[in-house]
């Protein structure tokens, strides 16, 4: 078992009150640049717009002004200043105050609000606070009529707090407890809709953490069988709306999944084809969706050579195509199942949210890509379950071979739309960098839906052209197609390859998430894709 742990259990509440009246461990006040006075003669550094903060500063004898001046705090995004308050009868009911800069205005994007929440989490964690409040120094323009702005900002800040508190310490002998249990939001509004939005944020951020821990798990722990077990556990936890079907190697052979099984053939760990199905309460289904995720729990076809002057190149070693690179990253090939982690995280969240009117199929052809005498060789011809033949000219272009049979399987379920997610090509990461996923689709309608979803989630995507003329380089003289083409436009030809396994009547999108699946600075998975997938399903819900 990968020993996936429960995410931080935090209770969120929205309250309408004066921030000076709050009681607890740490009060975090979101301060804009316009809340901080530029005048040096003023007794308080805070403007009339931030009346509540100026009032608090006065009651504290100017401590906030003094501390912010010493730290040159000006409300800029990323700035923060925290101070411990003196304890005495009659003073405020909180122990610490933290001023958190948010820039020129209160951030409106989900990503910026989430980053603010992560800053607050870091301060609360450092102080070992059990309770915290997030308050606004001044009401942002447009919030009086803009209920959605308030709801979305509160939800994103709450998500940032949960994600910021999480540390994956499953494989360390020492453990750290998360002390924070209660977070109040002041100035964001209140009511039932706000309560539902905060609960939604908790569900999704917990699912993101689940996905992160799956990707973080080492390959000796998270085998295809264990990934299938984790998926089955999700279905068991939400059995009122989710069911699990796990196909073994024999069943996959009966379904003629020759492309998928060719990849799995070299590993001692057998493949597991995973299919979760979400059906809404009441059974009324207006749309059928499928989400397909690449599930390579390890990709051995990566040889790292130090001091190499090229970034990435394919070479043939012992009859196999192996990537070589200047950076030692073979240990990170555990992240090659990031696509399946995203869809199972989304399944977990949707099992809690229970959207009506939509049926969703979560599919992953899980296996390992290893080297052995039973593995596929360059030049082999394999047959996918739709009858199309593939000449394997590159044994390291294995993810698309597993996705091919998974996409055929999804189409046979009679779905209307499919999104597949995969850490598919280094080419996409080179083109878009470490934080943006590439999307390829022939459907403008599906592109608009997903754009609305990722704008709500704060994740970053960019549409690449599905240039049909590039298909020429994928043609084989002995089979229907090759599994790779030229490195030039490699992310596009990968998308064109997958398109061969999708029915024309089905709206389909391919997401290449090779870049944003991993945070190299923090050396951990990101949980990328979960929140966008959930938003997309909700867009398709009645």
Curated annotation (Swiss-Prot):
EC numbers for this chain: 3.4.11.1, 3.4.11.5
Active site annotation, chain numbering: 323, 400
GO molecular function, one term: manganese ion binding
Catalytic reaction list: Release of an N-terminal amino acid, Xaa-|-Yaa-, in which Xaa is preferably Leu, but may be other amino acids including Pro although not Arg or Lys, and Yaa may be Pro. Amino acid amides and methyl esters are also readily hydrolyzed, but rates on arylamides are exceedingly low; Release of N-terminal proline from a peptide
Pfam family for this entry, one: Peptidase_M17_N
GO biological process: proteolysis
Annotated GO CC locations: cytoplasm
Cofactor(s) needed by this chain: Mn(2+)
UniProt KW Oxidoreductase keyword: no
Binding site for Mn(2+) 2: 299, 396, 398
Entry keyword set: Aminopeptidase, Cytoplasm, Hydrolase, Manganese, Metal-binding, Protease
Gene3D superfamilies documented for this protein: Leucine Aminopeptidase, subunit E, domain 1, Zn peptidases
Keyword hit for Ribonucleoprotein: no
TM region positions: none
Subcellular location: Cytoplasm
HAMAP family registered for this protein in UniProt: Cytosol_peptidase_M17
Assigned protein family: Belongs to the peptidase M17 family.
Listed name of the protein: Putative leucine aminopeptidase 1
The species this protein was found in: Oryza sativa subsp. japonica
């Amino acid at each position: 078992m990968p020993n996936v742990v429960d995410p931080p259990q935090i209770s969120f509440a929205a309250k309408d009150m004066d921030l000076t009246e709050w009681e607890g461990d740490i009060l975090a006040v979101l301060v804009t640049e316009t809340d901080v006075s530029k005048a040096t003669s003023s007794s308080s550094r805070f403007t009339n717009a931030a009346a509540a903060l100026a009032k608090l500063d006065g009651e504290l004898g100017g401590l906030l002004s003094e501390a912010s001046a010493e730290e040159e705090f000006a409300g800029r995004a990323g700035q923060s200043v925290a101070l411990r308050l003196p304890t005495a009868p009659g003073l405020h009911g909180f122990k610490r105050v933290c001023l958190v800069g948010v820039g020129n205005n209160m951030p409106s994007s989900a990503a910026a609000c989430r980053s603010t929440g992560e800053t607050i989490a870091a301060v609360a964690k450092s102080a070992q606070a059990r309770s915290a409040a997030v308050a606004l120094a001044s009401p942002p323009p447009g919030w009086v009529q803009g209920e959605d702005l308030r709801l979305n900002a509160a939800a994103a800040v709450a998500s940032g707090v949960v994600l910021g508190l999480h540390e994956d310490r499953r494989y360390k002998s020492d453990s750290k407890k998360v002390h924070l249990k209660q977070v109040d939001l002041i100035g964001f509004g209140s009511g039932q809709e706000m309560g539902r939005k905060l609960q939604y944020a908790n569900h999704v951020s917990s699912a993101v953490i689940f996905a992160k821990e799956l990707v973080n798990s080492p390959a000796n722990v998270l085998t295809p069988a264990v990934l299938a077990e984790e998926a089955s556990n999700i279905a068991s936890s939400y059995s009122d709306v989710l069911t699990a079907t796990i196909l073994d190697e024999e069943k996959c052979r009966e379904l003629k999944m020759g492309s998928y099984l060719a990849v799995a053939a070299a590993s001692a760990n057998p493949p597991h084809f995973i299919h979760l199905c979400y059906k809404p309460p009441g059974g009324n289904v207006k749309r059928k969706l499928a989400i397909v995720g690449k599930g390579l729990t390890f990709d051995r076809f990566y040889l790292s050579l130090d001091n190499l002057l090229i970034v990435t190149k394919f070479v043939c070693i012992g009859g196999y195509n192996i990537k070589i690179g200047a950076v030692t990253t073979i240990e990170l090939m555990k992240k090659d199942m990031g696509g399946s982690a995203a869809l199972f995280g989304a399944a977990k969240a949707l099992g809690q949210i229970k959207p009506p009117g939509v049926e969703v199929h979560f599919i992953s052809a899980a296996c390992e890509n290893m080297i052995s005498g039973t593995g596929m060789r360059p030049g082999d011809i394999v047959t996918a379950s739709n009858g199309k033949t593939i000449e394997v000219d590159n044994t390291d272009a294995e993810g698309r071979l597993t996705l091919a049979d998974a996409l055929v399987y999804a189409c046979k379920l009679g779905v209307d739309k499919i999104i597949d997610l995969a850490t598919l090509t280094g080419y996409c990461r080179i083109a878009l960098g470490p934080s943006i996923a590439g999307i390829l689709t022939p459907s403008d309608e599906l592109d608009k839906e997903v754009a609305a979803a990722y704008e709500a989630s704060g994740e970053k995507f960019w549409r690449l052209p599905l240039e049909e003329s590039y298909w020429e380089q994928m043609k084989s003289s002995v089979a229907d197609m090759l599994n790779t083409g030229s490195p030039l436009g490699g992310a596009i030809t990968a998308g064109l390859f997958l398109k061969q396994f999708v029915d024309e009547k089905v709206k389909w999108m391919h997401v290449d998430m090779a870049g944003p699946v991993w945070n190299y600075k923090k050396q951990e998975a990101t949980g990328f894709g979960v929140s966008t997938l959930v938003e997309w399903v909700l867009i398709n819900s009645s």
